[in-house]
């Protein structure tokens, strides 16, 4: 019999939590950052590298995998873990966000959403039941409910309609998910930037007795202050003994401030996307390797980093790779960025354990504020 899904809070510092999610395919140390493996790949990285930087779990995208190569094909080939050679936990999103943002001619009803592929225009249907079916075919460990995410700003009536629909879809997803030993389905709190709707959504989802809860519909155009206000309102309404996942977030600063409000899990394309566009994350803040100031600089990105990409290659070489559009440039900078993000999470976890989270957060923020090393 499969080991049951479990979550345990090991330490707290204020509202920040250090915990562990235990699943048959492995443990997830929280707070955790999940590299995004949209189509079964963390772009420009091979899976041993992703594991090597410290990732316990990656994210796969239901929408993209459904379109290509197809969930049924992945299932025939042994599931996403076997297909991608990643034997550790995988979380799949529901596909709803991409349907809303990428697809043309979509039509939303109580039943679900019909849409055309952004690749070839082929028609598809996505219902709560079909979303869970696809995620189960992929054999993901944590599955997300299908929801409707509204971009901000939006009219209050539209935000409320989408939130209520998402709650009804959560019930249907829960039924479709059933009892899958060792796995979990998370509900998604919606409600836009309205405090009352966020509370209603969080309370209704909590009453469903799910194994985890996500906060969705943030970092979609609103100021950071609004996002943090919604977290201040939402997190206390969610069960303290269940993991909390802030979807699609975010910058290192977003992560620090969200952990301080009780968030346990994060995902974002930012470190991988930035790496493909010449931008490096370091303890001194962001470094744009496209800038000419690096052309003759023999120094590494960060001599104190444990990542070879940051420690062993000169800025001049990285600048050359980026400006020449060499694939190795994207590979090295993505390696650096994911290493930085995982080191940030490691520092956060250690600080919570030693009750020094606020002080360590201030040190990290001060490092960003000091900026990059001076030009030679």
Curated annotation (Swiss-Prot):
Swiss-Prot/TrEMBL GO biological process terms: queuosine biosynthetic process; tRNA wobble guanine modification; tRNA-guanine transglycosylation
InterPro entries: ArchSynthase1/Queuine_TRR, TGT, TGT-like_sf, tRNA_ribo_trans-like
Catalysed reaction, written as an equation: 7-aminomethyl-7-carbaguanine + guanosine(34) in tRNA = 7-aminomethyl-7-carbaguanosine(34) in tRNA + guanine
E.C. no: 2.4.2.29
Catalytic-site annotation from UniProt: 93 (proton acceptor), 267 (nucleophile)
Gene3D superfamilies the record matches: Queuine tRNA-ribosyltransferase-like (3.20.20.105)
Keywords: Glycosyltransferase, Queuosine biosynthesis, Transferase, tRNA processing
Spans annotated as RNA binding: 248-254, 272-276
Gene Ontology molecular function, alphabetical: tRNA-guanosine(34) queuine transglycosylase activity
Pfam families: TGT
Superkingdom of this protein's organism: Bacteria
Sequence positions that bind substrate: 93-97, 147, 190, 217
Pathway(s) it belongs to: tRNA modification; tRNA-queuosine biosynthesis
Entry GO CC: cytosol
PANTHER family registered for this protein in UniProt: QUEUINE TRNA-RIBOSYLTRANSFERASE
Function statement: Catalyzes the base-exchange of a guanine (G) residue with the queuine precursor 7-aminomethyl-7-deazaguanine (PreQ1) at position 34 (anticodon wobble position) in tRNAs with GU(N) anticodons (tRNA-Asp, -Asn, -His and -Tyr). Catalysis occurs through a double-displacement mechanism. The nucleophile active site attacks the C1' of nucleotide 34 to detach the guanine base from the RNA, forming a covalent enzyme-RNA intermediate. The proton acceptor active site deprotonates the incoming PreQ1, allowing a nucleophilic attack on the C1' of the ribose to form the product.
NCBIfam families: Q_tRNA_tgt, tgt_general
Quaternary organization: Homodimer. Within each dimer, one monomer is responsible for RNA recognition and catalysis, while the other monomer binds to the replacement base PreQ1.
Family in the record: Belongs to the queuine tRNA-ribosyltransferase family.
Protein name, per record: Queuine tRNA-ribosyltransferase
